[in-house]
Amino acid sequence: MGVRDSHGEATATPDPVEKGFATLNTIRIGVKAMVQKDGELRKAEILSIRQRKDGPSFYVHYVDFNKRLDEWIDSTRIDLSHEVEWPQPEKPEKKKAGPGNKAPSKNAQKRARAGSREVSATPDLLTGKNTNIGKAQRPSKAGGKENRDETPANLSVLDSEAISADVTPKPEMEDVDMIGVSFTDTKEEHEQGKMSREEEIERLRTSGSMTQNPTEIHRVRNLNRLQMGKFDIEPWYFSPYPASFSDVDMVYIDEFCLSYFDNKRAFERHRSKCTLVHPPGNEIYRDDRISFFEVDGRRQRTWCRNLCLLSKLFLDHKTLYYDVDPFLFYCMATRDETGCHLVGYFSKEKDSAEGYNLACILTLPQYQRLGYGRLLIAFSYELSKREGKLGSPEKPLSDLGLLSYRQYWRETLVELLIEPGRESMSENELAVLTSMTEKDVHETLVVFNMLRYHKGNWVIVLTDQVVEQHNKRLEKEKIKGSRKIDPARLQWKPPVFTASSRTWNW
């Protein structure tokens, strides 16, 4: 008998977990076993198995841990003295008998014929020829976010056909490297928007992504290690580099031109010839420590694609790496006698219909927890101020991106509200002063419990906890120093683009 939830609806009883002892020969994908991790036994799921000369190796995901910890292990780390959990067998799909199996009525046949005539009479948006709805192709991502693959769920078949006809189709390589996302409105997705802050943080901790795409979660990381400049880096996620790169222990990336090599000798030969010592764009900001370069995705297509490939190693929700023409890339770099070393970047649509000021943001792992992420966010809002617009990042953000933005929003609002003479300010005034959207201002006030209902009105309140955190940050900045954007050093005017430079260029 099924179990009923709090709403009285019947829910399916979960299938019992099958357990038993296993050997190295019987372990298969989907098995959950106890694995040695940092001197402790932790439950891990086998996601992939590969055979090597020295024996099999297993790619595992540690249950209830962030997927960034997924790794290849050898058989000696699997404790077979404990029982394992066997994967559930795949159930055959049941054919449901419904109204669709019945013979259509005469009226329905007439409506179907009428609908067919209407569709066949619809001209193609590009060629002007009639479009056959039965040959509808998958819609392209034109006009979408650089790191998102989304088709509105409420589009009819005709609307999707019109969209795909209005843009240039994607290259064939996407069928191999990219994974589509289903946007059906499930109950689980609906309830995710109602999660508390604690539940949301817990989900970020264990999954590492705001997208929650189950196909991405189980995708195997394909590179072992990177050498970029003086740093050896361990990738976090899959990125569609050449398949042969997964067989080498180290991939070499030129930190200036971002070219990639699976052979050290080839990399050294390239370095002896490569003359690039900074991101290939206009330097629009320089202070004592850092510089910002504006790189046009259309003019520097190869470099920007290489940048997106590199980013995919650390952003699991990023799905595009070749459609860079409609984007500008603002790259932050530190300077020394050898050149300008890439620290991080954010991308921005040249013409965002929704008014977004950022599409994708990343601080490279070797520079994280040094305050550079906050500088990238602050710089994006400084550009919005120069444009005279309110800006907001596109969603979904990665887990680190979301936490960084919320911290920046809170600190920015508290700095304004704590100033003398600002005792009475509205959300609209805060938005104008910070170039944040009113929605972001409102959500930040709600998340940090700074919005209260008092005597029939909503008022902004600086709680003792918020003020204490602000004072601690100021004390830390006095000791360690702080990095801030100086608007006077920004040499930039909002660029103006032609119609051709804003669109996909295939």
Swiss-Prot record:
One of its GO terms (biological process) is DNA repair. It is found in: Nucleus; Chromosome. The active site is at residue 394. One of its GO terms (cellular component) is pericentric heterochromatin. Residues 83-155 are annotated as: Disordered. Residues 218-494 form the MYST-type HAT domain. A zinc finger (C2HC MYST-type) spans 251-276. SUPFAM superfamilies: Acyl-CoA N-acyltransferases (Nat), Chromo domain-like. It holds the Pfam family MOZ_SAS. Autoacetylation at Lys-318 is required for proper function. A motif (ESA1-RPD3 motif) lies at residues 301-322. The record marks 360 as: Important for catalytic activity. The ESA1-RPD3 motif is common to ESA1 and RPD3 and is required for ESA1 histone acetyl-transferase (HAT) activity and RPD3 histone deacetylase (HDAC) activity. Component of the NuA4 histone acetyltransferase complex. This is Histone acetyltransferase ESA1. The gene is esa1.
